[in-house]
């Protein structure tokens, strides 16, 4: 299970200040548990891990097997929370070069519907021309522009290449239980469907079929993922004392740093496989907290790569930042630095050391340098990359986000600002019903 260390923040805020949040955190947790806070229609994620049945997981695994048995490639069509959670888990657990391996134990997973790039979609459809592919269409409404557009293209291509009957078997819809374009299409075509619960918002949906089905198709153990999340649900429960509750401490610490003028949180990893965990985290916290002219800005870096781009700014730029480092305790493989007789690169002092030891010293050295440079640091230790640990990490961030949003004084479960660009886009595209908006926006151009 993960652990949290906040000691490297105490040169900037006091332990007593963090402890003083206990009453506020308790109130926030009660709002979550009793459903008395804003956004209480979207609390289905709170006890989701412990409520997922074995039968539900078996159904997901059976459907995943159908896709694995009948597809070389599976396209996950979704945007935001409809794909980021799945991608975060899949990329964290996959071999870095799965794409290039000749022997594959699961279909190649590709993502679509998360942009409107014509080149991306054209190149994807070209790649799929000689492939046995399937699609997981993830959309509660079925009318989200990016995803609906991609699915329209992929549905037609799948039917043209594989025939309607096979397409019916290898297209799965994850959507609303009763309504929406995706539900209507799925019922009409006879697709296998899974339900997105009404009370779970997209960015909190990784432990619903939204995330679990693609993760299972990719060959990973969703039973263990859910078990890790369920254990973290207990560890972060409202009955756990404040000082022992990692989600409570993380939420309190980041809010105290925010109140002390630290407006930007940078999520740091020293393992490139965690890149999409950071992308998922940015949406989770950005959409949950960025409203009412408030909110910590969530940013991320992949070290040591980004030490050669963002390192200068972090070390000596404006002191409005703090870092949360995901530290990986144990890696999967072992590789030692070889001895070289010529030693032209001067690296013989590392000969015989594991590459991971070099990476860990880079991590420690970076943390010390950044703290000395005025950047508070929190550290989340992940024992190893496994389904169980990743499940726990995701739930930890979700629970802390709910608490943190209420500490901040916002509704953590809505995202009204996301609609602004859509209204402008629809007006510019002359979508029926947007005539007045179209006139108004044309006057601005």
UniProtKB/Swiss-Prot annotation:
Q: Which reaction does it catalyse?
A: alpha-D-glucose 6-phosphate = beta-D-fructose 6-phosphate
Functional note:
Catalyzes the reversible isomerization of glucose-6-phosphate to fructose-6-phosphate.
GO CC terms on record? cytosol
BP GO terms, sorted: gluconeogenesis; glucose 6-phosphate metabolic process; glycolytic process
**Which family does this protein fall into?**
Belongs to the GPI family.
Enzyme Commission number(s): 5.3.1.9
User: Which keywords does the record carry?
Assistant: Cytoplasm, Gluconeogenesis, Glycolysis, Isomerase
Pfam families, sorted: PGI (PF00342)
Q: Where in the cell is it found?
A: Cytoplasm
Catalytic residues at: 287, 308, 422
Tell me the pathway.
Carbohydrate biosynthesis; gluconeogenesis; Carbohydrate degradation; glycolysis; D-glyceraldehyde 3-phosphate and glycerone phosphate from D-glucose: step 2/4
Gene name, Swiss-Prot/TrEMBL: pgi
Q: What is this protein called?
A: Glucose-6-phosphate isomerase
**One MF term in GO for this entry?**
glucose-6-phosphate isomerase activity
- Name the CDD domains on file: SIS_PGI_1, SIS_PGI_2
**UniProt xrefs under Gene3D superfamilies:** Glucose-6-phosphate isomerase like protein, domain 1 (3.40.50.10490)
